[in-house]
Amino acid sequence: MSGWKLGLDGFVTHFMVSGPQEEPYFNEAKDKNQLRYEAYLRSVIAEHKPVGETGEILVGAKSRLNEEWKYYYDSGSCFVNISTFYSVMRRIHFDIATVLETSSDIDVKAALWSYAAVDVYCNGRLEGALKQPVYKPIQKKELTLHLKAGRNLIYLACENLGVRDTRSVAGLQILNHKDEIKVSIPDEACADAAAVAEAFLESARLESNKLWFDSPAPAGTSYTYRYHEEDFAKAKIPAVWYQAEGKNEILLENGQPYVTVKVVSGKLELKRVFERTEQLVPKYALREDGSAFSFEENKELIFRRIADVMSESRGEKFGFPISNILARKHFNDNSMDDERLMYEMLEMIEERYDCSDFLMCGLIRYLHNYPVEGAMKERIKDVMLNYRYWMDMDGFDGMCFWSENHALMFYTCAMNAGEMYPDEYFPRAKMTGKELHLYGRNKVLQWLDDVEEYGFEEFLSTVYMCVTFAALINVVDYSESEISKRAAAVTDKMLSMLALHTYKTGIVAPMGRVYRSVLYPFDQGAMALMNLINPKLPYTFGEGWLGFYASSHYPIPEGLVKLMEDDVETNYTTGNARVYLEKNDDYCLTSVASPREPFTRWENETLKEDVDITTHNFTKSFNERFHGTTYFRPGTYGYQQHMWYAALDGEASIFVTHPGSTSEEGDMRPGYWHGNGVMPALKQQHGLLGGIYVIPDEHPIGYTHLYCPECRFDEVIHEENWIFLRKETGYLALWCSEKMEAHNGMNFNCEQRAYSKNAAYLCVCGGQKSDASFAAFKKRAKETLPSYDKESKTLTAKNFELSYVECKDVTQFL
């Protein structure tokens, strides 16, 4: 083969990868400030050992790490991204190799992008390095590659601290001589087969019930519908693969939203995942005549669904069974081996897996409701006495204590565990049970004080509100009366906010933290809560958190269904954010102001000297550093914040983001669709939302993209810089200052990109109540006459103006 061209913006996109090599990691250093502690661990973990002789770099051969070399393929990506989640701490090594070909000797300027520590070698010579890993934002290192005529081996030796969501990402961007460089891989014998397989997969076109390709499938091509299982027991069952060799098209089964196509040639393996958007539809639990079940009937159906799952999957390695066990106990269901699952769960708590506080919280609920005897009773006692209930207690682990949901989980677990064993000694806490109970109680009160005053930081999160709900009802059920009442009121507030943002068939809301389910408002986790309240709505599994509710006396407040169904135009504050919401029969438009009106944000105490790190205020500040700020301002680095939606129902919704990743592979926060790499300026007023996205040179991804699932709308019209959308009586129009280009990644006919680091968008909403027809709406939208001045970074339209003033937020560097 003659070699591949460089990718978008000069990125090298063809690599071989070895690893990750994962080793248990322990460090004897101690620090009660976990923020400072993990920063220290990142500063010392990289060893930067010289690479030396690499040996032959061949697909299937072992590298210097004693891990196999693999050809790396990730459709559309500009990076090697092998990010994953580590429940216990690990030392991570991974190596990356590519070949740059030139016809003459040239010195090439390049930019290395990574969150890891990386040494870059060109033909065995060290050319530059990133000295230590960071959590965020991504690091950039400019360097010079001294290329010789012919093939040049570029070798990246990468090291990272594996703790929770770990960004094992690296990219190499060529800044000059781009037309003089071709890319290959070290394994020349595999290069042709890789090129054939990749060209085949990249030629895919997804249409309803078919996958089309430009050429017959190569030998070794197969496909599967398997993607993700809620039940860990089912996740362990091998996927069924169907042969596709020689086929130009694959006929797809209805009801199968995911298809993975794999090409294998010897030890070479390439995969591409496709998501059939139209096959992902709302799920309803209704009677045969289409009517809704009563609240009590529906509640039992919810508990039954949770009980039927053996253990909630936490990835490929293990599951968390406690919610499922609680649901089975509700039915006195002994059909599964729950004793074995309990012992496995206790082992995970004892080893202090990240999120083991979820298990502990459920275990406490179990003990309050069901008798335990004999060896199990003693084992539970031993595990609970020796647990690490806060980050300043003895122990070394990678647990996240500080997010809004985790903090409350740990606080209430400490309060309840201490109360259960009042006279016992908790060695990691160095407290008696009575002392631990008071310690946890004080922290719970501080958490309630904060949320009552400021509102939620993880506001409207359709993932984490389910977790917080489970923690709150433990406080409601197992606390003294006054605390219980306050916790119930906060729970009422949380459910009221979610109900307010429930629009027709889904939750349409900006969010403090979000994941990829943001694409499907009808299928987000918190729809499990909304379906509990209103059985007419679609249901979701919601990670099984409602298993906690099977033994709770918390009463769902009245009036929530009315909040879901009434028209509203309002704004309110939560955390440091101001949220805008307008919903009616025709459309829903919602956003956060960026920036909001002048106000004083709450003070981040991690930036102060001699601060009391034992308070919840410090924990909350800590969380802002890790999990992103609700102080929305243009130019601030993003995390998991979702900033706006326009929707015609829970399926037909649109939004724009600056992606934090160039593909959907890897566990990234921000990701391809969830969160923003850099926050935009946003302003909402009646039926109108404007956004300005300016991407700094310090960020590697130079485009923004629109999520617009065309199959969800009855009518879609592309006209110059406009897209016009209709569903039933609702209308949307989106204008971009750049000409948008369609892109097909995991989803087809869902994405439009604006390849510019400086772009503006205007979203106009309407419907039959305000417009005589769709044609009349189109005319009205165009008459807003949007215009964007790149120099002054000002977006203007009829009765609308927004300017972009860049802000920096020191809390978002870690």
Model-predicted regions and their roles:
Residues M1-S75, Y155-V196:
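Accessory carbohydrate-binding/adhesion or oligomerization-edge regions at the termini
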Residues S83-H93, K131-K136:
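Extracellular beta-rich ligand/substrate-recognition surface
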Residues R90-I92, I96-V108, T144-A149, S203-A204, ...:
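Extracellular and analogous surface-interaction loops
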Residues T102, I106-V120, I154:
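Aromatic-lined ligand-binding clefts that engage carbohydrates, nucleic acids, or primary amines
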Residues D119-G171:
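Beta-strand-rich ligand-recognition modules
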Residues A191-N405, E435-V444, K536-L814:
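Ser/Thr/Asn(+Pro)-rich, low-complexity disordered segments
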Residues F401-D450, Y454:
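Active-site cradle of extracellular carbohydrate-active enzymes
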Residues I473, S481, K485-S552:
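Extended amphipathic alpha-helical segments with heptad-repeat/coiled-coil character used for oligomerization
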